[in-house]
Amino acid sequence: MRFLILFLALSLGGIDAAPPLQSRVVGGFNCEKNSQPWQVAVYDNKEHICGGVLLERNWVLTAAHCYVDQYEVWLGKNKLFQEEPSAQHRLVSKSFPHPGFNMSLLTLKEIPPGADFSNDLMLLRLSKPADITDAVKPITLPTKESKLGSTCLASGWGSITPTKWQKPDDLQCVFLKLLPIKNCIENHNVKVTDVMLCAGEMSGGKNICKGDSGGPLICDSVLQGITSTGPIPCGKPGVPAMYTNLIKFNSWIKDTMTKNS
């Protein structure tokens, strides 16, 4: 199946059909070196397509809409376009998209209003375990939900401009607020469900963007979400982004890793 980057072009005035979804960081800053050691860069045929999170030495979590036929990943990177001694390259032996994600959406040229992107997560089993270092460390799954209003951190190598495709070299971080789900329900034309999180800045100027899909949303130092969808232009005022709510999927994630290790 061909890869389709997911990101919504949304407006409060509404549209007949949104183009394919995409995600990236705008309004952020260069992450401190090795401050996000769980961050993964996911590639398709040498092209960076998504972010991911290292959960265990053999397992990376990303978004289901990042699905392609073959993957490779880089761990321990701070700079996307430079060779680094800390970086580790791994192939992916098998991918496990969540069975509840509607994979047929990835074949569409346009995303229809009301499309349901629930269950947007996927596990990647690495062909060789990651070596744990200062630059490469797994992060644990959440045990409880963060409170609304919590400060969250999203990260990735997605575009740093709202409408043009401009990848940064340095890993980008951006602080966002965890918002009531109604903020996303009122401002997105796709279906918003209770397995999603809503985060952003209602004033605009900061958000995830193209290339950040599958990356982490960390709230109060706890991994709570995986980047799923957001607006174009990125950082549009009044339109937060949506993330897969990981606490809803703890059992599936753990069971899948256990049964396929």
Curated annotation (Swiss-Prot):
Residues 19-24 form a propeptide. It comes from the Eukaryota. Keywords: Disulfide bond, Glycoprotein, Hydrolase, Protease, Serine protease, Signal, Zymogen. GO terms for molecular function: serine-type endopeptidase activity. It catalyses: Preferential cleavage of Arg-|-Xaa bonds in small molecule substrates. Highly selective action to release kallidin (lysyl-bradykinin) from kininogen involves hydrolysis of Met-|-Xaa or Leu-|-Xaa. The keyword Cell cycle does not apply. Pfam families: Trypsin (PF00089). Glycans are attached at N102. This is Kallikrein 1-related peptidase b8. Glandular kallikreins cleave Met-Lys and Arg-Ser bonds in kininogen to release Lys-bradykinin. The active site is at H65, D120, S213. The keyword Cytoplasm does not apply. It is an enzyme of class 3 (hydrolase). The gene is Klk1b8. Its EC number is 3.4.21.35. Residues 25-258 form the Peptidase S1 domain. Disulfide bonds join C31-C173, C50-C66, C152-C219, C184-C198, C209-C234. Residues 1-18 form the signal peptide. GO terms for biological process: proteolysis. It comes from Mus musculus. Belongs to the peptidase S1 family. Kallikrein subfamily. InterPro entries: Peptidase_S1_PA, Peptidase_S1_PA_chymotrypsin, Peptidase_S1A, Trypsin_dom, TRYPSIN_HIS, TRYPSIN_SER.
